[in-house]
Amino acid sequence: MKKIGVLALQGAVDEHIQMIKSAGALPSKVKHPSDLNELDGLVLPGGESTTMRKIMKRYDLIEPVRAFAKEGKAIFGTCAGLVLLSKEIEGGEESLGLIDTTAVRNGFGRQKESFEAELNVEIFSDAPFEAVFIRAPYLIEPSPEVSVLATFEDKIVAAKEANILVTAFHPELTNDNRFMRFFIEKMV
């Protein structure tokens, strides 16, 4: 059984753990660099990206997560995870630089502008995906290596490059585990 870690510093950790279980893998909480050992994949959940980056620095997780990706292991980032994984963050904040695109933090507005929307997702032909956007970012300026998987209002909200998958929305806050299944079955 594949073992998938969830960066457990803040955000929807428990929801991701349930989603990983529903997709047939074994979840594990990651709080320290040694927790990355023996993992097949890693999830960076939503939350507040600046706070997450500061906590990652405090626990010396920045370079170990980069090394995890450079080993070819898969990482799935949702919302703040998307922001952290992007090569650049509009406004110049530090990122992990693991997917060649730029993130626009809170691109769809603040908390009161949170919403749900049906998305047609490139990798799911069976039915639209009901996405939950909370202070959601979006992506701009993807390199040719980045596959755009979904857009909303002409803004990139899901993408993939090599072993990195990102969504601007929160699949873990729905009952639809297709993104997690795709991550575990096709990328890990």
UniProtKB/Swiss-Prot annotation:
CDD domains: GATase1_PB. Keywords: Glutamine amidotransferase, Hydrolase, Lyase, Pyridoxal phosphate. The active site is at residues 79, 170, 172. Pathway: Cofactor biosynthesis; pyridoxal 5'-phosphate biosynthesis. Catalyzes the hydrolysis of glutamine to glutamate and ammonia as part of the biosynthesis of pyridoxal 5'-phosphate. The resulting ammonia molecule is channeled to the active site of PdxS. PANTHER family: PYRIDOXAL 5'-PHOSPHATE SYNTHASE SUBUNIT SNO (PTHR31559), PYRIDOXAL 5'-PHOSPHATE SYNTHASE SUBUNIT SNO1-RELATED (PTHR31559:SF0). NCBIfam families: PLP_synth_Pdx2. This is Pyridoxal 5'-phosphate synthase subunit PdxT. It comes from Listeria welshimeri serovar 6b (strain ATCC 35897 / DSM 20650 / CCUG 15529 / CIP 8149 / NCTC 11857 / SLCC 5334 / V8). The lineage of its organism: Bacteria, Bacillati, Bacillota, Bacilli, Bacillales.
